[in-house]
Amino acid sequence: MVWCLGLAVLSLVISQGADGRGKPEVVSVVGRAGESVVLGCDLLPPAGRPPLHVIEWLRFGFLLPIFIQFGLYSPRIDPDYVGRVRLQKGASLQIEGLRVEDQGWYECRVFFLDQHIPEDDFANGSWVHLTVNSPPQFQETPPAVLEVQELEPVTLRCVARGSPLPHVTWKLRGKDLGQGQGQVQVQNGTLRIRRVERGSSGVYTCQASSTEGSATHATQLLVLGPPVIVVPPKNSTVNASQDVSLACHAEAYPANLTYSWFQDNINVFHISRLQPRVRILVDGSLRLLATQPDDAGCYTCVPSNGLLHPPSASAYLTVLYPAQVTAMPPETPLPIGMPGVIRCPVRANPPLLFVSWTKDGKALQLDKFPGWSQGTEGSLIIALGNEDALGEYSCTPYNSLGTAGPSPVTRVLLKAPPAFIERPKEEYFQEVGRELLIPCSAQGDPPPVVSWTKVGRGLQGQAQVDSNSSLILRPLTKEAHGHWECSASNAVARVATSTNVYVLGTSPHVVTNVSVVALPKGANVSWEPGFDGGYLQRFSVWYTPLAKRPDRMHHDWVSLAVPVGAAHLLVPGLQPHTQYQFSVLAQNKLGSGPFSEIVLSAPEGLPTTPAAPGLPPTEIPPPLSPPRGLVAVRTPRGVLLHWDPPELVPKRLDGYVLEGRQGSQGWEVLDPAVAGTETELLVPGLIKDVLYEFRLVAFAGSFVSDPSNTANVSTSGLEVYPSRTQLPGLLPQPVLAGVVGGVCFLGVAVLVSILAGCLLNRRRAARRRRKRLRQDPPLIFSPTGKSAAPSALGSGSPDSVAKLKLQGSPVPSLRQSLLWGDPAGTPSPHPDPPSSRGPLPLEPICRGPDGRFVMGPTVAAPQERSGREQAEPRTPAQRLARSFDCSSSSPSGAPQPLCIEDISPVAPPPAAPPSPLPGPGPLLQYLSLPFFREMNVDGDWPPLEEPSPAAPPDYMDTRRCPTSSFLRSPETPPVSPRESLPGAVVGAGATAEPPYTALADWTLRERLLPGLLPAAPRGSLTSQSSGRGSASFLRPPSTAPSAGGSYLSPAPGDTSSWASGPERWPRREHVVTVSKRRNTSVDENYEWDSEFPGDMELLETLHLGLASSRLRPEAEPELGVKTPEEGCLLNTAHVTGPEARCAALREEFLAFRRRRDATRARLPAYRQPVPHPEQATLL
């Protein structure tokens, strides 16, 4: 600013002095410091004596002139110029001993006292500029020695002056620092170090230089900090018993160093075995005397000066010694029945070569013990702990230096290994948040330690073990899912068991083993799913390009849904040679699981092939490249495609061809003429809820490009497109497969149901046919063995019950002959043809109140009969023969009439006009009893149904049946077939009133009130014998119908009749009395019965029907009166001994079979063998 102000004043003075006498000249004088210079001034006249005047020299910036001379008086001189200035040659000023500060503007003035002109005061002055050149000189420098704490900043300032102005630079150890770098910066002669380090210490030199010379200044920077190790220790190897030295030297400021040595982080002076043999020298070296094997290890040198953290340096000491056994236990336990190990604790340096074993003082030969081997460390491995392992063992190890000797003897003991008292299950499934207790306990000698570990990731503080060693997970968390192991270990052995814990009700677990296979413009991502948490999980693949700049942390991730059940996905449309990040996310109904680890992969570029030589480049038109960057976007208007034009186009682009497909179908042309100027297209004609793939092909002239990249898009939820209405061929394969499978399953199910129904109907029809055709098979007794003791007479124990065996019967039953209507006697030589006989109305055969077949009255004969039939009187047997065409197998339990000519269950008889139904016969009443229906153990009897008051009567074929000779009266006095059986007392109706009226009345009440008749319980059908004719069926008790249609059981001793007292057939409220079947045979434990009524019972029913239909009264035998034949048969029942009883029973059966065979021999229908007859043979 001073120089600027001086120049301004000087210019003002010059401008003012320019008037009248011209412009004054400015003189510049240059001098060197220390020398002299003359500032010229020629204002005095050159010749003559000048007038009286005053000479002044002014310096710009000074208030007073620096030099004033008046006449001969002594000059007045500024103190800064005293002794250095004087006039020379008039008014010129000579300055000696120039200084740098003398540089500046000077003005010379001469005032003539005799010529005072005020306006010319400034005219007698001239300006002179003095320039003083000097070498550089430092005005400010740092101290010669500077101490700075490590890691603190420091600034070194160096300021120099001179003319010309000098340039200041900094050097460190002779190297120019320039503008500085890193932590060091140099600017305007100032050196700044932001953070002083150990390497920053040294001598810094400041140098100021110009054309007049240079000046330097040195500063030593001392960094206060911890020592620096300049000579670290080195690894050493020494034989045992030799001395070793480990060097260690450090430098530091301040230099008050203290060295410390450590072995394996323990001060060597604190180790008792090293303390008497270790020395630390002044230079920091460690001296170790008489090394031992235990001296081997890592030794660390730590120098310290008390500042901050001291450094350290380590070296490893290796001691070589022969192989030796450290500590052989006196006893070694081995687990019984498990593998075991006899260890030989060995140490050796150089490494162990081999170990020799002795057992009981003799060399051990492993080849004599199968399963024994030696491990790499020399231990004996025993495959199975048994008595062969017992003994005393000793081992001797060897290495390249030899051996230190054999080991002490160890004695092998056999002990039981730990055994689990309670093992965990293989798997546990539990809801999250609940408590899970997994038991695990073991025992052994010594007691084992039971511990739980989780394989893989562990749980911190979430798993507890109670006093019983059971694992407690409270509460159960998602992290507890996985594989757990329970181990029990002691000195004998270690055993372990494991279990898997599945935590339900959680989000999916992270997927594992994510791998990415790079493909051209794509990548194939695969993974292993984790546990789904108990719900169906779905996967999605996330990917994004890797950021090229590290400071860019935001990424736009793209996700692709994975089909259900898949564990891989192909990611298309990636840029080649660009790194992408991939991750897989699992989700279920409860939320999302964690992302998998991120995997990097770069898609490969399309393979390139070398171009074939062709025309010069000027003649080859550029090829047409495919469209670029095809993207499909879902919009409210539909699917919108965006793309970029091809990069290479030989000439004008004509257009594009849009192709598309669904799933894995073939490509179809959707739009063959897309304008070449278009870069977007709204795709029409799509179907809702379909996944489409699109691609573009460009064409220009005769050139057609390759297809562009494929763009995938789903139309799910786009209402602008119609729902699926295409042909079944366009259905997705899973849906189509499901529909076809459902239709096939339904068809197969219907077909199987039809076949099963047909088969069941055929079997039911066959079973019914066999039941109709089959009658009770005859009983054939095998020859008796040894006779039983007499004391066995009358025994009712199960041992006395006859055992039966079912066999086939070649003889047709009487029921077949009765059902088919064939005569039982000798066939007539001229039998009437079926056509001439004509149908006869049949009397319904019903079951009586006691369960037996009974007959009702004969039906009135038709009005139209042949002459022979009208003239010939009807016998009761002929009239009763019609009754065998009735059956009581109707669902309601009422008698159902059947036709004799056609009894097939498949083809029912043709409908005929209904006729008045006759009253039910005794046999049908018998069959309609509720307890008789309960006696059908085969389950074929239809259940009782509630009667309908408006139910129409069942159809009955009233055509007459041919008269059978079997039903004719015998020549001998008629004897009831029932009377031929022992113990049978039959009351025939002898009064004018037919006895069937009581039965009809009772049957009517049964039909009207079937629900009021209690059925006999099924529990009453208790079998006491293995035969079919034994007491397997409980006989009906003697009952009397009450007003409500029920029956009451008589006293146990009542065996006379069903009606109590003197009541007989003429009474309407009673029915015929029948004795218990238990008294019909000589054997009280056996009866000639079967599942269906027997032959004799049917014959007896026929006889009863004949007796009840006779017009003439017959005398009714009194109750308890027996015929001579009955008495004879009854007397046979009182035999003594099982052998006699069996012989009598055999005679009775042989007589019965002779009568039956004689009867069936006359029936033609019985000459044909029955398909599946049965016999009951007494074993």
Curated annotation (Swiss-Prot):
Keywords attached to this entry: Cell membrane, Developmental protein, Differentiation, Disulfide bond, Glycoprotein, Immunoglobulin domain, Membrane, Neurogenesis, Phosphoprotein, Repeat, Signal, Synapse, Transmembrane, Transmembrane helix
What positions carry the motif PDZ-binding?
A: 1177-1179
What role is this protein assigned?
A: Functions in dendrite outgrowth and synapse maturation.
Which ranges does the record list as Extracellular topological domains?
A: 21-734
**GO CC annotations on file:** axon; dendrite; glutamatergic synapse; inhibitory synapse; plasma membrane; postsynaptic density membrane
Annotated domain remarks: The PDZ-binding motif mediates interactions with MAGI2 and SHANK1.
Q: Which residues lie on this side of the membrane: Cytoplasmic?
A: 756-1179
The protein's name in its UniProt record = Protein turtle homolog A
Q: Which residues form the Ig-like domain?
A: 24-124, 136-216, 226-318, 322-410, 418-502
Q: Where is the Fibronectin type-III domain?
A: 507-611, 623-718
- Biased-composition ranges, Low complexity, are 785-800
Q: Which InterPro entries does the record associate with it?
A: FN3_dom, FN3_sf, Ig-like_dom, Ig-like_dom_sf, Ig-like_fold, Ig_sub, Ig_sub2, Neural/epithelial_adhesion
Q: Which family does it belong to?
A: Belongs to the immunoglobulin superfamily. Turtle family.
Q: What's its membrane topology?
A: Single-pass type I membrane protein
Q: Where is the composition biased (Pro residues)?
A: 613-626, 826-836, 906-919
Parts of the chain that traverse the membrane = 735-755
Sites where Phosphothreonine occurs are at 972
Q: Which residues form the signal peptide?
A: 1-20
Q: Name one GO biological process term.
A: homophilic cell adhesion via plasma membrane adhesion molecules
Task: List the subcellular locations.
Answer: Cell membrane; Synapse
Sorted alphabetically, which SMART domains does this protein's record hold? FN3, IG, IGc2
Q: Which organism encodes this protein? A: Homo sapiens (Human)
Region Disordered, as annotated, extends over 606-626, 767-919, 940-988, 1015-1079
| Disulphide bridges, residue numbers | 41-108, 158-206, 248-301, 344-395, 440-486
Please list the residues annotated as glycosylated.
Answer: 188, 256, 513, 524
> What molecular functions are annotated in GO for this chain?
cell-cell adhesion mediator activity
Q: How does it assemble?
A: Interacts with MAGI2 and SHANK1.
